[in-house]
Amino acid sequence: MAGYQEERDGSEHSVSILFTRSAGEQAPVTAQLALLPDELGNKTAEIILNGQSLGTIQNFSEEGNAKLSEKQTTELLTALKGNASIEVVFGEFKEKVSDKGAAAAMLKMDEFQQRLNTPSALIRQGQEKHAVLAQQAAPKIEAVSVNNRQTTELKRGEKQFDAVLALLRKSNGTNEDAENYCYELHKDDVWNKQITLYPLTKGKVLAQAICSSSAYNYTNYYAVLDGKLSKVEQVLENRYNYADYDKNTHILKIEGSFKARGLGDCWHGQEAVWNGKTFILTKEYPSGSCKGFPGGAWGPLPTFVSELKVK
């Protein structure tokens, strides 16, 4: 659960507080504070809760993050159950952190972790003894290493480029209202000037071409072809814009990373790997709200993770 500076007219200085709790009955809640490094001044900050100081925070990382004490965390959580006035003083600045929706977010945390009406709940505490959500191992996903990792670039004007492009366009269809339709793929312009072929296993090939582009994002069109480049066997969702082989495991990974706005302070993305038959999702994440932190206040906040098993 992450909170950010309160929106107001005029200049805002980026502030975020992140509360984290693992699954498990005895799992504690930890909290971190994030500020922009250039605004930290003497590398210390102070939290003012309902007019009272919670003490000085030090030991900020180079990224501008610092862990709060157990006492500071507990007092903030207690106050956020109702109306809380939270101010952070740092350098020459003072910024108010919004408490809107905090109680509802904590209730959602309790509900997801099956803590409602138990002693470990944050909001709706009770004496029920039922089990809460236990920690679970990340799902194991198989990926295969690729022996031949020599990519091929097909250039516009080459006979093979034209043939493969025709296959890709046919596989993408002609319905411009379709969710997976790629406008740039069907245009003969500067964006659509090369196709990259990545060898897979069992004689198959991954083809990469441009799909769409905007002011600050682009997607690629990815399709699995047979080794003779005569037919498209699989088409991937338009969620990716990068492919490469891992230098250590030699697996082929595709990634998608996208800004929510041009400032680049909020992102979302996902990753997938070739398992010998298809590409399977291995990671998915947002980065939180758009609040002025380059890359997001906390970087990727995964909603899905996995453990890779390479064959």
Explain the meaning of each model-derived region.
Residues 161-184, 287-307:
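Surface-exposed loop and turn segments in beta-propeller and other repeat-based domains
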Residues 195-214:
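Exposed beta-strand-loop-beta-strand "reactive/processing" segments of non-cytosolic proteins
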